[in-house]
A protein has these predicted regions:
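A conserved active-site cap/scaffold subdomain adjacent to cofactor or substrate pockets
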Residues: 1-33
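Conserved glycine-rich FAD pyrophosphate-binding loop
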Residues: 6-7, 28-146
Length: 146
């Protein structure tokens, strides 16, 4: 694992004991317990309890920091960003799309998924109709119209 949060780079080394020890000696830094990674997995780090909306943003791993208000955590070597922000939904979707990714509102509420272009939305409608003709599986879960 590779994560940047709270002005610190967190690296989780995995593998055989000898390989991990050699990598640890080469990289240096502080050795910490697994607690950080467990708190990240369970969304118990301080970021997740801050006020604002929680966003899960998938981007190319080399995408730059997003210029948005709020706190960011960069995970998966840069490909996954957690953002706690009060920024406008459309602004977050636009910035994620312009960086080659997409944003999903993770906090409760409607409309968390990025708006789909009309042709792709029609495809989703047709697929949903084929797979769920009675409309019983998660109606309105991703998009109110589905």
């Amino acid at each position: 694992g590779l994560c940047y949060f709270d002005n610190a780079l967190w690296i989780r080394l995995e593998g055989g004991e000898g390989s991990v020890k050699a990598a640890r000696e080469l990289l240096g830094g502080e050795e910490v317990a697994d607690q950080f990674w467990q708190q990240l997995r369970e969304q118990q780090l301080p970021l997740f309890s801050l006020p604002g909306t929680l966003w899960r943003i998938s981007l190319p791993s080399d995408a730059p920091m997003m210029d948005l208000p709020g706190e960011q955590l960069i995970d998966w070597g840069g490909a996954l960003r957690w953002l706690k922000s009060t920024a406008d939904d459309n602004q977050i979707h636009r910035i994620a799309r312009n960086a080659g990714g997409h944003a999903t509102r993770f906090s409760a509420g409607d409309g968390g998924f990025a708006p789909l272009p009309a042709p792709l939305f029609r495809y989703h409608q047709q697929l949903k109709q084929q797979l769920d003709p009675c409309g019983v599986f998660n109606p309105g879960r991703m998009y109110a119209e589905l």
